[in-house]
């Protein structure tokens, strides 16, 4: 299974244009508040866009970011957001001790307690991009905004949470709706990738969606699974000592796009996503990727590309790439000094992503 990225939508009759900028990220920055036993244990910069841009910037992949924040935004970020002076920044509270979720998993309970303005089509630049990433977390991406993205990006990757999240009008608790009822379904045949967690995947028909685009379902310690037309493949995880799951799926998607930008096949790019996700869960808030680890990963990516260019038989030798990435993964600084968040009173050590 090679699964190369979907081809550019340009045709031989398309007008000549300047070279693409690489990646466009669309989604609001947030302020994340982590709460356990009634006490705030951490407050950090959040939002999928922040985790993804961290991965891309650390990997030296050029990206533009469109994000809106309120007048109260105080974080120092590499990619400046649009400030809505009459609004407050989107805030999420994550409760790690409110019981078991609706499908029997010990997990966090997430609430949106404030929301900044949505991102409009007019906020999106008119330049062309190789890849677009629709990664809203608080309902900020509109159908017309996604339509603008598919018009200006050769390939668009969408996180399903940007499409199916709704919020309780009383306490802001995050709930999910079926993808067909989200208001975005009519656009999805034009996107390249749809990423979902295993829980979120219950809100779509994977068998149907895999014929519209490449579907990637993440499943924590089991790695991830790729669905595209008649092909399916499981991509193995990396062992991780989980501290906080926030941002793991976002870092996964960032790693996936880094791999695609570098010219890897989809399974190899997803393996890179698993690596970045596994590092993220070992930190509270934004991880700081070790420079030595990043260089080793870059070296292995280049080695993998050369290997696959020499012989197509290496495309399916996925385990070797995993084995070579593992030492690079564990050359990063150990995160054992990070405080542990307990989910329903239990530590989340020794999980894999």
Swiss-Prot record:
Record GO terms (molecular function): ATP binding; inositol 3-kinase activity
Catalytic activity, EC: 2.7.1.64
Keywords of this entry: ATP-binding, Kinase, Nucleotide-binding, Transferase
InterPro entries: Carboh/pur_kinase_PfkB_CS, PfkB_Carbo_kinase, PfkB_dom, Ribokinase-like
Binding site for ATP: 197, 247-250, 274
One Pfam family named in its UniProt record: PfkB
Similarity remark: Belongs to the carbohydrate kinase pfkB family.
Protein's recorded name: Inositol 3-kinase
Source species: Arabidopsis thaliana
């Amino acid at each position: 299974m090679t699964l190369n990225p979907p081809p550019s939508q340009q045709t031989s009759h398309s007008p000549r244009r300047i070279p693409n900028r690489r990646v466009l990220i669309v989604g609001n920055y947030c302020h994340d508040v982590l709460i356990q036993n009634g006490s705030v244990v951490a407050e950090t910069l959040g939002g999928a866009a922040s985790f993804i841009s961290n991965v891309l910037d650390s990997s030296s992949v050029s990206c533009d970011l469109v994000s809106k924040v309120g007048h109260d935004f105080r974080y120092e970020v590499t990619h400046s957001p649009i400030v809505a002076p009459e609004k407050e920044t989107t805030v999420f509270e994550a409760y790690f001790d409110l019981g078991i979720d609706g499908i029997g998993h010990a997990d966090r309970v997430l609430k949106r307690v404030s929301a900044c303005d949505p991102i409009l089509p007019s906020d999106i630049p008119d330049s062309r991009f190789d890849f677009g990433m629709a990664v809203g977390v608080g309902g900020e991406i509109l159908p017309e905004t996604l339509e603008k993205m598919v018009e200006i990006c050769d390939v668009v990757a969408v996180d399903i949470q940007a499409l199916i999240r709704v919020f309780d009008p009383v306490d802001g608790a995050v709930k999910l709706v079926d993808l067909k009822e989200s208001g975005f379904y009519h656009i999805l045949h034009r996107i390249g990738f749809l990423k979902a967690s295993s829980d979120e995947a219950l809100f779509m028909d994977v068998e149907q969606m895999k014929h519209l685009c490449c579907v990637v379902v993440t499943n924590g310690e089991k790695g991830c699974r790729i669905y595209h037309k008649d092909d399916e493949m499981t991509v193995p995880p990396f062992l991780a000592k989980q501290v906080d799951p926030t941002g793991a799926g976002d870092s996964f998607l960032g790693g996936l796009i880094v791999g695609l930008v570098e010219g890897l096949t989809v399974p190899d790019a997803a393996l890179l996503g698993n690596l970045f996700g596994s590092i993220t869960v070992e930190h509270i808030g934004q991880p700081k990727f070790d420079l030595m680890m990043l260089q080793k990963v870059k070296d292995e990516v280049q080695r993998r590309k050369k290997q696959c260019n020499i012989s197509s038989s290496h495309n399916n030798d996925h385990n070797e790439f995993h084995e070579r990435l593992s030492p690079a993964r564990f050359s990063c600084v150990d995160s054992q000094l990070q405080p542990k968040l307990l989910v329903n009173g239990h530590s989340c050590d020794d999980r894999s992503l």
